[in-house]
């Protein structure tokens, strides 16, 4: 099924007083976690947020590369009363991934492999997430994720098929193309060439070019000297984005998470084994994960459906220009 989404969602973000605090769980204290690389990890810390009344069925939100478990901070179009993630109706869980830097166990706390941080996988992250759900008493989930979170949703479908009822995958392929791996390689090389923060700034600038589109930048960054005399607006915009990320993100996490995405290469046969309903959403102007690529993977899923978000703003449209996507996601998540 293909749909063109064009109506904006004008509902306000959730009120601050309804935003819960971050919580922390300590997992794998008795039985250690075996990583795909062969390393054993004991006492894994997982930072997470929950919304709504605890239940044995939850909606599991999977965050993007530099995201956090605080869904209310980055996805107000999706979280709130009357929205796809409705705390008055649903029990919603979002956890910071293993290897990230927003409260969960990070690369510096993991056993090293040949003197380097261990090569984490998305399946490792799914196994940690499963342990958290068991800790919370959750037996079944509907999954929603975008970008890296969408790729992680594929990992959940393959690693935990007994837990997942259905999934919404937004702006994500099942496996990275040479193009996507190349962009990540350039970003990682920038970090390694200039450790200590400067490389991370450049990595973010590279990424931002793939998160938007030529049309988006023409609409929003075509000025000259607006922010700094004699400097193109696109230049100051990219520099600002790099500075912002460098104050809140860890370069080792950036290396670990982009590497995990690149290593996730499920076969077509594995994708055809997924038996639950999956809504796959492409974005019309996405240059990072072109819609034709995303649609191809949807076609491999026996119960896959495909929708396309029409937006000029590229990959990040799921955050900044979701239009009618929240309504479509809500209908799918709740079986309409």
Swiss-Prot record:
The keyword Magnesium does not apply. Its main location: cytoplasm. Pfam families: Abhydrolase_1 (PF00561). InterPro entries: AB_hydrolase_1 (IPR000073), AB_hydrolase_fold (IPR029058), HAT_MetX-like (IPR008220). Keywords: Acyltransferase, Amino-acid biosynthesis, Cytoplasm, Methionine biosynthesis, Transferase. GO terms for cellular component: cytoplasm. It is found in: Cytoplasm. It catalyses: L-homoserine + acetyl-CoA = O-acetyl-L-homoserine + CoA. Substrate binds at residues 204, 316. Residues 58-321 form the AB hydrolase-1 domain. GO terms for biological process: homoserine metabolic process; methionine biosynthetic process. The active site is at residues 147, 286, 315. Pathway: Amino-acid biosynthesis; L-methionine biosynthesis via de novo pathway; O-acetyl-L-homoserine from L-homoserine: step 1/1. One of its GO terms (molecular function) is homoserine O-acetyltransferase activity. Its EC number is 2.3.1.31. Transfers an acetyl group from acetyl-CoA to L-homoserine, forming acetyl-L-homoserine. Homodimer. Belongs to the AB hydrolase superfamily. MetX family. This is Homoserine O-acetyltransferase. The gene is metXA.
